[in-house]
Amino acid sequence: EFEHNVEKYTIPRSYIGKGFYANQLKIWLELFNSEQLIIISTEDLESNPQGTLDKIYNFLKIPKNHKLIPEKQKKSSYPKMKNETREFLINLYKKNNAELFSMIGQKFDWDN
């Protein structure tokens, strides 16, 4: 159960630690300038796979030679997260997410 393990996974390489995206992006920005990076959200990839792939092609300045033909995959189901846990995570990431959104100039709807 997710709630049982929340406190256990607060170290940097943990589930929760990996969610501090601004911290991760800072490391990449030490190696590359922002024009060399593209930020793709999972939500965009899932809702518009071909459009997202086209965006990547444009970013890389390569021909759009491939059309995405998604394979049907079995999706795993997860237990519903408790509202208290969702609120805990929203509050935990709030400051870091604000910093991330400022860094990348876009905002994701992660408060739901």
What residue spans do the PLM features occupy?
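Acceptor-substrate binding/catalytic loop of class I
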Residues: 12-20
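The conserved 3'-phosphoadenosine-5'-phosphosulfate
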Residues: 5, 26-99, 105-112
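PAPS-dependent sulfation machinery
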Residues: 1-13
